[in-house]
Amino acid sequence: MDSQETKVFENVKQENPDEKKPKVEEPDSQNNASTQSQQKFLDFQLSWCPESERKTTKYHLLKFHSNKAIDPSKSFVPPIKMQRRDPNAPSSSNGEQNAEQGSSSNVNIASIAPYGGAQNMKQNAFKRKTRQVVKVDPQARRLQEEELSPWIMEDFEGKNTWVSTMEGGQSSAYVLFMFSENGFKVIPTDRFYRFNQRNNFQTLSIDEAEAKMNKKTPIPRWFMKKESEENLAEAGSASPMYKLKTVPNARPVTGPRASGSDDELDYDEEFADDEEAPIMEGNEEDNKKLKDKIKKEMLTANLFGEADQDVDLEEENDRQMSREGKKLQRYLKLLEKNLAYESDEEDEDPYASSHDASSEEEVLQEEEELQKREEKLKSRFSANASKTNTPRPLERTPSSVSPVKASSQLQSPNTSIQIRPQEQLINKPGYIILRLSSEKLSRFANDFPRMVPSMGSTETSVGDQVEVVGDTTNVPIDDSNLITEAEVMKALRAGPISIKDLVHLFQRKIRADNRNRLGIQKIIRKVARFENKLLVLKNY
């Protein structure tokens, strides 16, 4: 086959006999007119590119890999530049600076051994020196070295950047058909490139990426893509945004905490496990008490012996005293007709019921009823004592006698009390034994349920029979536990004091005698006044 001129017959299209088309007759085929009338062919002459032209000129084919039609003359900003370079390499100006810095790089001399490579030579003295050599086609190696730096096409603004990738290889062959005078000219292509558009966002170099990874702070996956958005956010308003909301009933959450509130919750946890420990035998209540005791001992063990029972008793006394103080505060509010004592009630439970916070009218009614009951009790007691002029002992067992605590001692000679030998053990100062019938005792307990504990009596059975002989109307009352004006004035001279602290000072006397509850209120009204929610001594 001649490389200069080669005739190739190509079947272009078979003519349909039904269609009316002009007949084309070749000058050399006049004798075979009958055969050519059935089938018609078009001859195209293909001429191969001469060898001399192939040595001087090489033809490369490029293709833009995109869904859209790419026209560099329209979409690219001129001038368009196409060159071979590393896509990750910096620009020319940065490259010159890096070259200058690389020439003056500091080398750690301490890492270089003084004897050079003598140690390695000593180790490899008896090792056979071998080298593996692989023969590679020089043309293929040259092609590989050239393609290490791909073609990069970019416009003037740098918005359109396309990176080439060679397709095919040594085994592929592509040709181009170019129009010529007599037909087509066949030109073989040396390489076929596919151009892919590079991402618009910035990427980090190897050194920069390694520096980012060495930091302990977490790095998001697409932080380079979001860098521009963060810059825009920083440019905007950096003031924090606050939101307000309305609350239906805003009350302080803080309040007095009960003792043992920090302990663990008491609950029973059961697991349906076949491998669990066997169930403890014995009474369940005893086992539960034992567990509670062990739990308390474990909690108190952390105090290292600092726990004191007296401290717990003092806290309980303060807690009881606070109830008395609340009553006193209500009276003082009624006296001053203002809310000067609201701050002293900060320790109240915000979730307390309305029954605990009674109104002022209820407090006054309660005190009036208390005074009436005391008067009735005194009158009935004096009447019963006057009727019994002669001793009338009753049979009873020693266990039926129970002591009754009184706030005053009987010192009148007109009163005679029969005391049996078994009762001498409980006849102490501050105690008397009254001999009353069971009917009177039951009637007294039913009519005055609150006065019995107020007078200091203990629990007694209905069958107890106590007899009082003589007249008890002239029995003097012990006023040693009453609070006096001098004591209150002495406490106020030390300085301004709150209601709670003042009640705490007279705590023992208020418990000893119930008359101090109303007495201290009258004394405070007389000798004290309020200033900045504190009690101050009046100027006489």
Swiss-Prot record:
UniProt feature, compositional bias: Polar residues: 29-39, 89-106, 381-416
Start-end of Basic and acidic residues biased regions: 1-26
GO cellular component terms listed in the entry, alphabetical order: cytosol; nucleus; transcription factor TFIIF complex
Pfam annotation, one family: TFIIF_alpha
GO MF, one example: DNA binding
Signal peptide per UniProt: none
InterPro entries: TFIIF-alpha (IPR008851), TFIIF_interaction (IPR011039)
Phosphoserine modifications at: 259, 261, 399
Ranges in a coiled coil: 280-382
GO process terms (BP): positive regulation of transcription elongation by RNA polymerase II; transcription initiation at RNA polymerase II promoter
UniProt KW keywords: Coiled coil, DNA-binding, Nucleus, Phosphoprotein, Transcription, Transcription regulation
Biased composition (Acidic residues): 359-369
Annotated stretches, region: Disordered: 1-39, 70-106, 341-416
Top-rank lineage group of the source organism: Eukaryota
Cellular compartment(s): Nucleus
Description of how the protein assembles with itself and partners: Component of the fcp1/TFIIF/polII complex via interaction of tfg3 with both tfg1/TFIIF-alpha and tfg2/TFIIF-beta subunits.
Family: Belongs to the TFIIF alpha subunit family.
Role according to the record: TFIIF is a general transcription initiation factor that binds to RNA polymerase II and helps to recruit it to the initiation complex in collaboration with TFIIB. It promotes transcription elongation.
Name this polypeptide is given: Transcription initiation factor IIF subunit alpha
Species assigned in the record: Schizosaccharomyces pombe (strain 972 / ATCC 24843)
